[in-house]
């Protein structure tokens, strides 16, 4: 068996060690054909089929590893990336990196929340109030943009308890369903930042073989994401209804038209649609004369 630790010049990728983002990254790499030998007890993993090394770290360490050129690529939430960037710029440090693409997972929002019984109309109601947060720089930027002075209270966890504990009047924290806020007697009042995961690269040029591998990975990621947003549609259509049926299909440009072996009045139509095909549209297609309608998922795409 080949010893992967002896391979030189591997592409180094930093990923979050635990949590939902870690799971989504593992799924994405698998979909891109990267075979990783994962071991939960080890902080470094290796690809079996490509010269790739995975560093499994805390999510808030990933931006710094990219900024400092320690790793070549990283997948990180945009909220964590921008918070770290703003913090470094506030300290007059130079920050350089390349953002290659946004990914289709890691959705979250950074929101302001207050006690459910508080009267709130807009952000100016928080003037001179104390706000607890784990994202002081994103919060400060938002409040400055709105011309509101406030007092920041930095908490690295359990931010939701701050109002009930008398630590702060309001909080600024990540929200998904809002269930945690509700459980702590809070209500979401303003979204200040929306985030997804993104793929970033260190600013320093990579050697040609590494950059070629980055380009290959990026192409595969884009193909996986495009496929996830697309459907392959097959149907039979009367020749005289082709124009009408094509107009009903969302996101379709040039369908493939094929003759049917034993039917000269109809043809087979194959199309890739980059929009969802709802039941209502399928019913409209049937009313227009289409039959044998199949809608299939697409695993991979390359244009």
Swiss-Prot record:
The protein's name: ATP phosphoribosyltransferase
One Gene Ontology cellular component: cytoplasm
Family: Belongs to the ATP phosphoribosyltransferase family. Long subfamily.
Reaction(s) catalysed by this chain's protein: 1-(5-phospho-beta-D-ribosyl)-ATP + diphosphate = 5-phospho-alpha-D-ribose 1-diphosphate + ATP
Keywords: Amino-acid biosynthesis, ATP-binding, Cytoplasm, Glycosyltransferase, Histidine biosynthesis, Magnesium, Metal-binding, Nucleotide-binding, Transferase
Description of how activity is regulated: Feedback inhibited by histidine.
Record GO terms (molecular function): ATP binding; ATP phosphoribosyltransferase activity; magnesium ion binding
Entry cofactors: Mg(2+)
Taxonomic superkingdom: Bacteria
Pathway: Amino-acid biosynthesis; L-histidine biosynthesis; L-histidine from 5-phospho-alpha-D-ribose 1-diphosphate: step 1/9
Naturally occurring in which organism (per UniProt): Haemophilus influenzae (strain PittGG)
Location of the protein in the cell: Cytoplasm
UniProt-listed GO biological process terms: L-histidine biosynthetic process
Enzyme Commission code(s) on record: 2.4.2.17
InterPro entries named among the record's database cross-references: ATP-PRT_HisG_long, ATP_PRibTrfase_cat, ATP_PRibTrfase_CS, ATP_PRibTrfase_HisG, HisG_C, N-reg_PII-like_a/b, N-reg_PII/ATP_PRibTrfase_C
């Amino acid at each position: 068996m080949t010893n992967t630790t002896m391979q030189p010049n591997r592409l180094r990728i930093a990923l979050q060690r635990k949590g939902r983002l870690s799971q989504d990254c593992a799924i994405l790499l698998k979909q891109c054909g990267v075979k990783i030998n994962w071991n939960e007890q080890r902080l470094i993993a290796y690809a079996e089929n490509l010269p790739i090394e995975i560093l499994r770290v805390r999510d808030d360490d990933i931006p710094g590893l990219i900024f400092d050129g320690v790793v070549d690529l990283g997948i990180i939430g945009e909220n964590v990336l921008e918070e770290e960037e703003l913090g470094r710029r506030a300290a007059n440090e130079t920050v350089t990196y390349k953002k290659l693409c946004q990914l289709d997972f890691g959705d979250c929002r950074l929101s302001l929340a207050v006690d459910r019984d508080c009267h709130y109309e807009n952000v100016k109601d928080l003037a001179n109030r104390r706000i607890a947060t784990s994202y002081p720089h994103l919060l400060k930027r938002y409040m400055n943009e709105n011309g509101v002075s406030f007092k920041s209270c930095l908490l690295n966890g359990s931010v939701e308890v701050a109002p009930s504990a008398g630590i702060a009047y309001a909080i600024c924290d990540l929200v998904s369903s809002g269930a945690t806020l509700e459980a702590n007697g809070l209500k979401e009042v303003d979204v200040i930042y929306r985030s997804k995961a993104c793929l970033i690269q260190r600013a320093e040029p990579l050697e040609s073989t590494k950059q070629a591998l980055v380009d290959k990975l990026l192409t595969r990621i884009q193909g996986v994401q495009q496929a996830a947003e697309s459907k392959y549609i097959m149907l039979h259509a009367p020749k005289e209804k082709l124009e009408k049926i094509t107009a009903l299909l969302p996101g379709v440009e040039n369908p493939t038209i094929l003759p049917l072996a034993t039917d000269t009045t109809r043809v087979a139509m194959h199309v890739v649609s980059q929009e969802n095909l709802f039941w209502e549209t399928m019913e409209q297609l049937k009313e227009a004369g289409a039959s044998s309608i199949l809608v299939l998922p697409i695993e991979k795409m390359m244009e």
